[in-house]
């Protein structure tokens, strides 16, 4: 409780908006003394009453007017029910809704602001609040309370009873409470943001009520989830224009599938922390941009390393802006028969307030503790989709896949997932790779990792430098993943922005692909050997040759896919899996980044060697090929490759 006393402060002129006859009267502040405890928040029923405790016998008089003013400037007069030297009771108007209100007391033409209060307005609960409870409430739909909804403050986890009521013994560390949206229900939206959480209003030791109202929906067993990889919006390199191409593609895809339920999950790095301050483009600007361009789609969000405030000096403060604007950094929800978990796997406790941004890829012990409690309510037969920003594993030329997280932390995380069928979805790399349960790195667990390509591809650089080419460091086109869910069955597909779902691979006639130092005439002749050698890796990979080899980039490849290549005579050519640099990305980005007279160090965002490539050798330079790729779900894509096949950036622009 906070004590408020009325004494002379200032002269206030205020037009009172009210349903009463006092509306429109100008009131002048003057000194009159009333003392009572004004709580931070109160729980009231609609049209109900509340008792305020008076101090030192200084209570209001019967002719005083008690006023609540909403954030929209609407004032409500609360009639006195009774007044004594110990307390007074007011009736809260039925029109008042949950929210913050300024509290005024008016005596004759004198009016004084007392302070601010938060009203939690709801139905009366059949509940005795436990002694240690600090957060409680009801989860309900139009049909009444919903039993079995999991509720958490990020530390403690509880479940609603048969009336939809929950209680939490919360220290209120995170300042919010959230529900794990139950199957068959949806929450309301604020733009693209699903409102599955409530921000806490009172101090840690003060009990407060937070209710959740859900909408019952049907047909949730069959739906799509759009996995949206790194966006990196910063209002530079024409990113906002390119982003509108993505949202147009997204909206066109949704329009082409009318009547199908769709949700989306952003995989992190919606923003670019380096430009929050220098370019005045941060989380609010991201939300403003996407809310203008995408309507009627709930996007659950994941925090990425570029969504933290680099000016902070610890993890808690670094993620506070994200929490304030978007959502909790870890939570869970259910859609149909699938349980989704969103994890924060970026640890910023080593931040020093500078752009050094020293972070670690790890899941905090607090999250692991919460996850164990969350999964205690999830049957082992329920498939899990776990979403986090940074990759858990990473391909290695020598070792297949390796753990790319804190090793001890990862072991603890995987141990919690034992017995479940788990699909982990990540971003961060801006490239595409897939880990399947057959990989030794999963240690025999039924775990998949889908590292999903970026919406921004090469941080928006490829289309900026070479208009019409929007690809990432491994040659994956900028785009997003489409997951089809039917009951407990999941299917996935990667879709490139600006083209159909049938664009799943790219072929190169290596007789036509070659790079040399003549491609970078502006690169300084005295550039360091380190920088020059970085460029020479592309020259050495693709010298001028006539070996009649064809390179095929299948960016969403996994071991369950098949590749078949036949020549025009019907001969089967045996593909060889290779690590390679994508030639189109070399030409569209790397060559142009190295071809600079001001070059002094190795440029960022250049082509990386990656494993989802295959080579075949044709009989001669003119032999045409039929290339057929098939995924594990039976989707088949074919190219009739006419050779020689031209290699220029213009030839590879999407038509």
Model-derived regions, located:
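Ser/Thr/Pro-rich low-complexity tracts
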Residues: 22-125
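Metal-dependent phosphoesterase/phosphodiesterase active-site architecture
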Residues: 127-138, 142, 192-202, 206, ...
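Short, acidic Ser/Thr/Gly-rich low-complexity loop/linker segments typical of extracellular
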Residues: 147, 152-170
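Extended active-site neighborhood of metal-dependent phosphoesterases/phosphodiesterases
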Residues: 184-201, 275-378, 404, 408-423, ...
């Amino acid at each position: 409780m906070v004590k408020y006393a009325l004494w002379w402060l200032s002269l206030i002129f205020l037009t009172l908006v009210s349903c009463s006859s006092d509306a429109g009267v100008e009131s002048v502040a003057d000194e009159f003394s009333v003392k009572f405890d004004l709580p931070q928040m109160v729980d009231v029923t609609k049209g109900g009453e509340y008792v305020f405790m008076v101090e030192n016998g200084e209570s209001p008089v019967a002719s005083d007017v008690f006023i609540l003013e909403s954030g929209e400037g609407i004032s409500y007069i609360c009639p006195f029910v009774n007044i004594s030297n110990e307390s007074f009771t007011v009736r809260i108007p039925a029109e008042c809704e949950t929210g913050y209100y300024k509290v005024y007391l008016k005596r004759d033409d004198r009016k004084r602001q007392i302070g601010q209060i938060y009203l939690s307005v709801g139905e009366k609960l059949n509940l005795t609040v436990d002694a240690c409870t600090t957060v409680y409430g009801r989860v309900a739909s139009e049909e009444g309370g919903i039993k079995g909804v999991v509720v958490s403050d990020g530390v403690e986890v509880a479940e609603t009873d048969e009336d939809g009521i929950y209680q939490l013994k919360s220290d209120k560390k995170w300042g919010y409470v959230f529900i794990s949206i139950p199957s068959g229900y949806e929450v309301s939206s604020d733009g693209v943001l699903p409102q599955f959480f409530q921000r806490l209003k009172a101090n840690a030791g003060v009990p407060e009520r937070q209710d959740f109202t859900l909408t019952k929906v049907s047909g949730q067993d069959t739906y799509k989830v759009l996995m949206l990889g790194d966006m990196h919006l910063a209002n530079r390199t024409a990113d906002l224009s390119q982003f509108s191409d993505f949202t147009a593609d997204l909206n066109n895809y949704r329009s082409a599938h009318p009547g199908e339920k769709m949700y989306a999950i952003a995989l992190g790095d919606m923003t670019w922390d380096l430009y929050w301050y220098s370019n005045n483009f941060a989380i609010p600007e991201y939300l403003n941009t996407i809310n203008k361009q995408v309507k009627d789609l709930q996007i659950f969000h994941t925090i990425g390393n570029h969504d933290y405030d680099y000016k902070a000096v610890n993890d808690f403060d670094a993620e506070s802006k994200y929490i304030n604007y978007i959502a909790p950094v870890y939570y869970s929800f259910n859609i149909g028969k699938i349980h989704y978990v969103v994890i924060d796997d970026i640890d910023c406790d080593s931040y020093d307030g500078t752009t050094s941004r020293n972070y670690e890829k790890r899941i905090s012990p607090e999250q692991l503790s919460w996850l164990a409690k969350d999964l205690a309510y999830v049957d082992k037969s329920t498939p899990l989709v776990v979403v986090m920003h940074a990759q858990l594993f990473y391909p290695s030329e020598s070792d297949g896949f390796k753990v790319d997280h804190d090793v001890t932390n990862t072991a603890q995380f995987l141990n919690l997932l034992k017995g479940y069928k788990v699909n982990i979805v990540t971003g961060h790399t801006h490239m595409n790779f897939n880990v399947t349960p057959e990989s030794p790195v999963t240690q025999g667990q039924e775990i998949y990792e889908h590292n999903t390509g970026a919406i921004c591809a090469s941080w928006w650089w490829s289309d900026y430098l070479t208009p019409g080419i929007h690809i990432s460091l491994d040659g994956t086109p900028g785009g997003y993943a489409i997951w089809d869910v039917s009951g407990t069955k999941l299917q996935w597909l990667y879709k490139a922005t600006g083209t159909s779902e049938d664009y799943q691979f790219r072929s190169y006639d290596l007789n036509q692909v070659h790079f040399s130092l003549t491609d970078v005439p502006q690169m300084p002749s005295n550039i360091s050997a380190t920088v020059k050698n970085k460029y020479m890796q592309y020259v050495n990979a693709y010298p001028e040759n006539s070996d009649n080899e064809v390179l095929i980039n299948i960016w969403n490849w996994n071991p369950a896919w098949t590749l078949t290549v036949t020549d025009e005579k019907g001969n089967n050519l045996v593909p060889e899996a290779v690590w390679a640099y994508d030639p189109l990305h070399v030409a569209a980005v790397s060559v142009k980044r190295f071809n600079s007279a001001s070059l002094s160090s190795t440029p960022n965002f250049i082509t990386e060697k990656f494993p989802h490539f295959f080579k075949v050798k044709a009989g001669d330079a003119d032999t045409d090929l039929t290339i057929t790729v098939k995924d594990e779900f039976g989707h088949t894509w074919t190219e009739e490759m006419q050779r020689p096949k031209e290699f220029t950036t213009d030839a590879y622009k999407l038509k």
